[in-house]
Swiss-Prot record:
GO terms for molecular function: ribosome binding; RNA binding; translation initiation factor activity. One of its GO terms (cellular component) is eukaryotic 43S preinitiation complex. The lineage of its organism: Eukaryota, Metazoa, Ecdysozoa, Arthropoda, Hexapoda. GO terms for biological process: formation of cytoplasmic translation initiation complex; regulation of translational initiation. Residues 46-208 form the PCI domain. Component of the eukaryotic translation initiation factor 3 (eIF-3) complex. The eIF-3 complex interacts with pix. This is Eukaryotic translation initiation factor 3 subunit K.
Length: 222
């Protein structure tokens, strides 16, 4: 869905055009931006700049604060881990937002993900599943981040552990993630995440040092 912002002169701009000018700080555009965020959640799209602009507008206009939109912005930022989007969004929160119980829950979930305690994350996510059920692709976005961490941490991993880290998924779902990440089976119980040769590669480094660079040092040694 295309969102157009109507200017005072009667002309319309796209959200991206509006964000590139002073109009991004106009509270008259807040409702359009909030609708855009709801579409991101529904259609599994993401626009960090627009989302941060909404939080900034809340800072300037706290009487227009919408907690539901704030939840969606924070949860969508989690779907873009390992990028630091959540940290940037959190830094724009108002004191009344920080005191909100649901926002504290989301912050706790973010901390758990940052610690890579994925088993605990999925447990907490199940308890709070109504919080992000409106966000299309949320679980798979988190699994993508889990896969990233697994890929840089393990060479081989037990199949049952991998299923647990990915949220207690079924074998058929696991197969799709193995294929997506280029992993391979080793026997019945192990998954090869990365071959040793792929992890360790020699690199020859040649540095050219001019005589003038060391001349003064050599003179001191004489």
């Amino acid at each position: 869905m295309s969102h157009l912002v109507k200017m005072e002169n009667g002309q319309s701009q796209t959200i991206q055009e509006m964000l590139g000018c002073i109009e991004r700080y106009n509270p008259d555009h807040l409702k359009t931006l909030e609708a855009y965020i709801q579409d991101q959640a529904k259609n599994n799209t993401y626009d960090l700049e627009a989302n941060l602009a909404v939080l900034k507008l809340y800072q300037f206009n706290p009487h227009m604060l919408n907690f539901e939109i704030t939840y969606t912005i924070l949860l969508k930022s989690l779907t873009n881990l390992p990028h630091t989007d959540f940290v940037m969004a959190k830094c724009l929160l108002l004191p009344q937002q920080m005191k909100d119980e649901n926002i504290q829950t989301i912050i706790d979930l973010a901390d758990i993900l940052e610690r890579a305690d994925f088993t605990l994350f999925w447990q907490r996510a199940e308890v709070n599943r109504t919080m992000f059920r409106h966000i299309s692709g949320f679980h798979d976005s988190i699994r993508k981040f889990v896969s990233h961490v697994v890929s840089i941490t393990f060479q081989t991993i037990k199949k049952d552990l991998l299923k647990e880290l990915l949220g207690g998924i079924e074998d058929s779902t696991l197969e799709s993630w193995i294929k997506r990440n280029g992993w391979k089976h080793q026997g019945q119980d192990l998954i090869v995440v990365a071959m040793q040769d792929d992890k360790i590669k020699t690199k020859n480094i040649t540095e050219k040092i001019e005589f003038e660079n060391v001349g003064a040092l050599m003179a001191q040694c004489l």
